[in-house]
Amino acid sequence: MYEYNFDDAPIVIQAYDGFRIIEVKGRQFIDCRDPKHMLLRDYFVAYLNNELDSEMVEDFSHRYPVSFLVDYIHLFERIDGRNRRELIAFLKEEKKKRVASYSARQKKGMVEQGDVETVFPAGTEVVFAEHDGGLIGGIIKAIKLQQSFWTGPYFEIKLSVIHAVKGEVQQGFYTVHMPGFYGQVPLTSLPLRKPTDADKKFLADRGKKFAKFWKPGTYCAYTGTLIQPSWWSARTFRADGRVVIDPISFERQEPEIWRNCIQSAGVSIDREERSKIKKEVLIRESDFWRCVPQLYGFSLAVKQWGRFEIDGMSEIKWRDDAWDKLVVDAESKDLIYSLVKFHGQGFTDIIEGKGGGTIFLLHGKPGWGKTASAEAVAELLHKPLYSVSVGELGTSTDALEKRLRNILDVAVIWDAVLLLDEADIFLEERDEHNIARNAMVGVFLRLLEYHNGVLFLTTNRVKKIDSAFYSRISVALHYRSEGKAKAVWTNLLSAAGLDPTWAEELTPFNVNGRQIKNAIRMGQTLARAKDRKIQISDLKRAVTATIRFETEMKLANPDEAIDAGPIQTVEVAAPKRKRKTETKSAKAASNGV
């Protein structure tokens, strides 16, 4: 179908009793605007409405393009009297001319703008090459020639495709735009073409991935960009990592971003053919080639909702050995594993609707496995890990409630392990002088009361926890540092492909697990800088730098170092000089200097 801009003055080519032929910008129309021509217009509307969408017929207003009408001569055989004879005679003559002209162009492989619908009639299988080089496969539903004030004429092409924007596989439409053109151009220069065998294979392979990942709650790996379109532009995020496909939660939690995503992608639902594909069959293999190239969900890496390209999706390569390498006592590991794996299979509460969640409180010095425990058990059980920092929850009561409620909701829907790291601000005992923080703690307590999922809370300040949390916490585990260093060094050295026997020599350095990981990365960088293999001396150098920094921070801020533990004595010149200076000052003070 076509739409035209009639702002330019028409040129009358020929006038008949019942209609007249006009030309606008080189294109011919049958004009029925004059009151004496209204009878023919009524015939057009009546007969065309039987064959076409009434909305498409209304687009023509009083002027019908001759190039369109010549394909519907059979409909006008029923028009009475002289009007019919004149109209059919004119259209047949025009069709003869157009067929001859079109045949001549076709032999040369050329097309005019008016040929597009003839070359690609409704029902034609096509592929469309988008401006970024990506291919869309589909079946032509309709073509409209539109007019833009900014860009001039363009074709709006509606393709019948397979999508899952509502969380179920559906027939739908994918709208693409093709620039208009003047004169004759090679058919091969158009981004719209009939698919080759290679096109079909490429699109079918992508469609298989669509069939694998479309279902809401699917957890997969992703390499590529997350896109959040807006009216004028698009926000993009490098989202390498793991994602959860969930268009339903996306639409509920971020309706504006969701709406922009769908509109910019040109996806719409075919309400007449909705749900024709049976859910138990999922998608027929013959339809793989016309599955849309995007899915919608949440990136756990950048913590954003948006659109993902299917080409970047893959199955997760699980690190099942992460649990075995976790340096935590056997009893604690068994408790965590059992409660997470069989969560939700026991007694919940007498009051319906109250939470049956499992809440862990992991406390102890930094760097000794609290965060790693949540990560490792999620990896072992192949569940999503949704890690949240306090800063993501907002600083006001309203923001906290909305954000935390959304997070808890999707964590349950995805059967995810939820980790709220360094949750001290929400766990600390309430203070009658700090009303704002008291309100936030109250919101936090209430939402935990009704949470049905698995939640890990970590803190370094267990002694300051508000007593109201005691009954909300299912299990509290204390993470100690004593006797773990050698095992942590051994595991991390092995994971990095280094000699695990180095652990014996490195264990005396008083560093935690997180610092050990950083030291190994720093040591590898030092070795690469010298273009040689890493040596134990590189690790010692890295560890010494870490300890020097920590020592200086403790001496500068003694109040902040109360819970940090003793520092391993190492040959670090700067800290020793500082201690000596302080000792002399203290001695002078005692002598009354």
Regions found by a protein language model. Give the residues of each.
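Intrinsically disordered, polybasic Lys/Arg-rich low-complexity tracts
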Residues: 576-588
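Short, polar/charged, Gly/Pro-enriched helix-capping and turn/loop motifs at alpha-helix termini
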Residues: 418, 458, 499, 530-534, ...
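C-terminal domain-closing interface element
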Residues: 428-431, 566-576
